[in-house]
Curated annotation (Swiss-Prot):
Boundaries of every Clp R domain copy: 3-144
One biological process term in Gene Ontology: cellular response to heat
Native source species: Staphylococcus epidermidis (strain ATCC 35984 / DSM 28319 / BCRC 17069 / CCUG 31568 / BM 3577 / RP62A)
Membrane-spanning segments: none
The protein, known as: ATP-dependent Clp protease ATP-binding subunit ClpC
Lineage: Bacteria, Bacillati, Bacillota, Bacilli, Bacillales
Keyword tags: ATP-binding, Chaperone, Nucleotide-binding, Repeat, Stress response
A Pfam short name: AAA_lid_9
Domain UVR, chain residue ranges per copy: 417-452
Region listing for I, in residue ranges: 163-410
Length: 817
């Protein structure tokens, strides 16, 4: 907070505020202590104005003690509350509006009046202070704004009228204290000062990724000039931020743009104390260069080379390479200064420097833990943006969310509002119908409700005023989860139970295959508990086994349990990648080829949904070289697409399915997967499968996979369970047509028997159900049998399937197939 611009009396007010907080044993300095501090300076304008409204020091003390009372014995350093910080900020804003160089007691009072929340605002309300009249009285007591300040400002601006209309003076903004503090960029600011102090080509250009703080360095220079922390050569300089869009805007005719830019350059040359800051420096190239006219960069080149124009540029690495480097004459006139992304530790320090501003704006307390969480979580989970920008945005949005949540109107107030509206409408209807007695009763009822509403509203506001809303680590995690879809909040009891019982959830859809289900469940639990390797995917698995045993179904079931729907799974059918060059479809077509701008089928989906299940189905069908691209995904959790963007796979579950080796195992007596689920038989099966797998895939690929799981052949009992699941799905579909079906155990056993084929797994069951159930039901529906609203029982008598149709309460009719 900038206390250097406070008058001596205003500084004493802050000292009195601290003394009052200590006297009342309060742990923070709030708006009420600032008000008490103002009353302790009776000669100040603020105290005189308040006394003129019959508000005395004793009355204020009485109200404050009544509202918040004395605290426990306070310990440690006193800090300003977010609302008190906001009041100081508002007082500086008031001083600037009135063209005053210093902040006095009167400006602090104006700040308290503008801050309509907090204890001070409640004191004013309780003492019946007319806010509008009080403000007018303060302005009247001050007299007219100081003309000397206005004239000084006018004289300063008269030298550069065109420039003032097109640019923002960062030094003036820094003097007003409205620029955010710049933390941890001393090295870069010093380097900028060194380049600016050169005799010729004294033009630094700040190059760095978006969001690393390039513009902040120019603002830091302006603040250093205001504080006199620069060499003699830069003292009293003005840093003017020029927007090329504003310069070009409105130049309808040829030569108008060039004339405007020349005038700006002449004013800068004559003034001799202007440093031009051009954000997005690459916009110089081509600006105003339509119809053969020369562009802005060519107009500026001579002045930049001779040192007549001091210019700081800022641009990204990509734009510098595309626009500045290709023009060698322009490039040599600028001295590049690399601005690197700060570390997580540096980002935490930057956030601590900005904390006061965000606390004042959102009127909440921001803890150190929240700042650390913002820096660490944004660094880990938001991979396509840069620190400190993404961490600052995270703090800003989380603070906004907490603030809005704490100020949502309670339901009882909304109910009273609705009741008032209802009574108003009834009263208007009664007046219209000339039922005046009824209208009078309704008017009285409305008055009572309005009073009740005001009382409830004041009670809620008073309760809110006494609360110190704080931003916690959990709030930061909630916002990150909203941005990325990755669950980071603390695990609640419901989710904990769901994760612990994940095997049961998966078994509702996948019958048998305990090894696969257990392995997948453990990987998900490790990730959610925060124990997984942060540089690798949540888990990577190869599912081996014959067709139709549930490999793909398990991936679908996992996607449904994690995201609520099977469609959340990213499915890549490897049969589409039988040719070597097809790998480009995963990461995007190379430059110059059709589809380069569309991105890769895999990388784009993962960029949009970083928390997902990825299924590579039937991997043995793809060309072996396709899997080379997955090596760094399995090991380091990232993949670079054809546009050079790094895609983060660290929050994905990667599942690959294959039935490689299934034929060889089928030829062996024990290796039909049946009865080989445990003991040495299962190990033999596994070794056989691994041998076939090694013949098909390279060792460096297999070595990176977390687990290779062999699926077992489905037994008859398991097939019967699958029949029950399939019948339940059919029952659900028919219930939408108001048809109820019941399939007996005998019928299910017969369907399982007809659909049993150890070579093809569960898929023949689909055909068996179609043949025995669906075909006959469709004929019954189309044959004129009105079975809507009736129940159909499907049974097997040892020879054939029987279909009994009957009303829910009536006797059965019997038809046979």
């Amino acid at each position: 907070m900038l206390f250097g611009r406070l008058t001596e009396r205003a500084q004493r007010v802050l000292a009195h505020a601290q003394e009052e907080a200590i006297r009342l044993n309060h742990s923070n300095i709030g708006t009420e202590h600032l008000l008490l501090g103002l009353m302790k300076e009776p000669e100040g304008i603020a105290a005189k104005v308040l006394v003129s409204f019959n508000i005395t020091e004793d009355k204020v003390i009485e109200e404050v003690e009544k509202l918040i009372g004395h605290g426990q014995e306070q310990m440690g350093t006193l800090h300003y509350t977010p609302r008190a910080k906001k009041v100081i900020e508002l007082s500086m804003d008031e001083a600037r509006k009135l063209h005053h160089n210093f902040v006095g007691t009167e400006h602090i009072l104006l700040g308290l009046i503008r801050e309509n929340e907090g204890v001070a605002a409640r004191v004013f309300a309780n003492l019946d202070l007319n806010i509008t009249k009080a403000r007018a009285q303060v302005v009247k007591a001050l007299g007219s704004p100081e003309m000397s300040n206005k004239n000084a400002q006018a004289n300063k601006s008269n030298n550069t009228p065109t420039l003032d209309g097109l640019a923002r003076d960062l030094t003036v903004i820094a003097k007003d204290g409205t620029l955010d503090p710049v933390v941890g960029r001393d090295k870069e600011i010093t380097r900028v000062i060194e380049v600016l102090s050169r005799r010729t080509k004294n033009n630094p250009v700040l190059i760095g990724e978006p969001g690393v703080g390039k513009t902040a360095i120019a603002e830091g220079l302006a603040q250093a000039i205001v504080k006199n922390e620069v060499p003699e050569t830069l003292k009293d300089k003005r840093v003017m931020s020029l927007d090329m869009g504003t310069v070009v805007a409105g130049t309808k005719y040829r030569g108008e743009f060039e004339e405007r830019l020349k005038k700006v350059m002449e004013e800068i040359h004559q003034a001799g104390n202007v440093i031009l800051f051009i954000d997005e420096l690459h916009t110089l190239v081509g600006a105003g260069g339509a119809e053969g006219a020369i562009d802005a960069s060519n107009i500026l080149k001579p002045a930049l080379a001779r040192g007549e124009l001091q210019c700081i540029g800022a641009t990204t690495l990509d734009e510098y390479r595309k626009n500045i480097e290709k023009d060698a004459a322009l490039e040599r006139r600028f001295q590049p200064i690399q601005v690197d992304e700060p570390t997580v530790e540096d980002t935490i320090e930057i956030l601590k420097g900005l904390r006061d501003r965000y606390e004042a704006h959102h009127r909440i307390n921001i803890s150190d833990e929240a700042l650390e969480a913002a820096a660490k979580l944004s660094d880990r989970y938001v991979s396509d943006r840069f620190l400190p920008d993404k961490a600052i945005d995270l703090i800003d949005e989380a603070s906004s969310k907490v603030r809005l949540k704490s100020h949502t109107t309670p339901s009882n107030l909304k109910e009273i509002e609705q009741e008032i509206d209802k009574v108003k409408n009834e009263k208007d209807a009664a007046v219209h119908a000339q039922e005046f007695e009824n209208a009078a009763n309704l008017r009285d009822k409305q008055s009572k409700l309005e009073k009740q509403y005001e009382d409830a509203k004041n009670e809620w506001k008073n309760a809110q005023g006494g609360l110190d809303t704080a931003l916690s680590e959990e709030n930061i995690a909630e916002v990150i989860a909203g941005w990325t879809g990755i669950p980071l909040t603390k695990i609640n009891e419901t989710e904990s139970d769901r994760l612990l019982n994940l095997e049961d959830t998966l078994h509702k859809r996948v019958i048998g295959q305990n090894d696969a289900v257990n392995s997948i469940s453990k990987a998900v639990r490790r990730a959610r508990a925060g124990l997984k390797d942060p540089k690798r995917p949540i888990g990577s698995f190869i599912f081996l086994g014959p067709t139709g045993v549930g490999k793909t179904e398990l991936a679908r079931a996992l996607a449904e349990s994690m995201f609520g729907e099977d469609d959340a799974m990213i499915r890549v059918d490897m049969s589409e990648f039988m040719e070597k060059h097809a790998v480009s479809r995963l990461v995007g077509a190379p430059p110059g080829y059709v589809g380069h701008d569309d991105g890769g089928q895999l990388t784009e989906k993962v960029r949009r949904k970083p928390y997902s299940v990825i299924l590579f189905d039937e991997i043995e069908k793809a060309h072996p070289d396709v899997f080379n691209i997955l090596l760094q995904v399995l090991d380091d959790g990232h993949l670079t697409d054809t546009k050079g963007r790094t895609v983060d796979f660290r929050n994905t579950v990667i599942i690959m399915t294959s039935n490689v080796g299934a034929q060889e195992l089928q030829d062996q007596r024990f290796a039909g997967f049946g009865g080989a689920s445990e003991g040495s038989d299962y190990e033999t099966v596994r070794k056989t499968m691994m041998k076939e797998l090694k013949n098909s895939f390279r060792p460096e690929f297999l070595n990176r996979v977390d687990d290779i799981i062999v699926f077992h052949k489905l037994t008859k009992d398991e097939l019967k369970e699958i029949v029950t699941m399939m019948v339940n799905k059919l029952t659900h579909r028919l219930s939408e047509q108001n048809i109820n079906i019941v399939v007996t155990d005998k019928a299910k056993e017969k369907i399982a028997e007809e659909g049993y084929d150890p070579e093809y797994g569960a898929r023949p069951l689909i055909r068996a159900i179609q043949k025995t159930v669906e075909d006959n039901l469709s004929e019954l529906i189309l044959d004129g049998n009105k079975i809507e609203g009736k129940e159909v029982t499907i049974d097997h008598d040892g020879k054939e399937f029987k279909y009994d149709i009957y009303e829910i309460t009536a006797k059965k009719e019997t038809t046979e197939s």
